[in-house]
Amino acid sequence: MQRISKTFHHESYFKKRIQGLIFSSGQRVIEDPKKYGLPGFTKYYTMNDYKTNNQNATFLNGIEIDFQTRFWYLPNFLRGLVFNTNYTWIESKVKYPRTIFEQTIVHEPEFDVLINNVDSTYIDRLLDQPQEIINYSIGYDYKGFSGRFSMNYISNIFSATNFWTELRQDTDAYKRYDLSIKQKLFIKGLELYINASNLSEAVDITRLRGFSLQDSNFDDSYYDYMLDKIHSNENTSIDEMLNNVPRKQRSKAYEQHYGKTIDLGFRFLF
């Protein structure tokens, strides 16, 4: 008699090219109100949240590995063990438009201050896209019983663009644990279930790339290091210097507490 394998393994590589990505590019001066369908008096007003289509193509590629198995070859009650895992790695590169306000003072034919939008770009990851996603679950099935303990991990996500590097936002890596159990009862179709979510009470934190000198927990040595770098080399990249600041030293934009939830009940399947 031949036994059929109860193991599934899958690997894939994906690549995407996105054209016309819509995103919030920050502030923009209204040079020509007609261009935006606005009345004439709004000339030189500022749009605080200007959404636009990115004229630069967005490139994204990555790999995904999926593995599922049931330990049918183990002796006795251990045959009910199951294990599933999924790993995704993603790399993205986006040229985001960056608009600088340029002021020009003219004296002829009359005194005036002209404001123009000077467009440039900066490179970063795709918005709302993590670099790594890891999922796994360990479970056990036996007759009418089924249980799963699972973990979900999402690496930090680029969550908000901004003209100023230090005001761009990333989330901290997020990891949570869940538990799901069900047991069939003596009445056909009736089940007892328990669902427990976020057992470790993980907190979702979003941080600015900059820091605050007013924060009592901030280590001033990082700021002193940045000043020394700027004095020794005026062309030093602010992006590189901010990347050297540990995540927990950066200012929090906000944090969300979801808490732990446990559901207990009966379910009847028709």
Where on the chain are the PLM-derived regions?
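Solvent-exposed loop segments that connect transmembrane elements
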Residues: 25-51, 97-122, 163-165, 209-250
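Outer-membrane beta-barrel proteins
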Residues: 2-5, 67-75, 81, 142-144, ...
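Outer-membrane beta-barrel architecture
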Residues: 1, 12, 64-68, 137-139, ...
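Transmembrane beta-strands of outer-membrane beta-barrel proteins
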Residues: 7-11, 79-85, 136, 145-149, ...
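Residues that define the transmembrane beta-barrel architecture of outer-membrane proteins
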Residues: 5, 57-63, 130-134, 173-177, ...
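Gram-negative outer-membrane beta-barrel transporters
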Residues: 15, 36-158
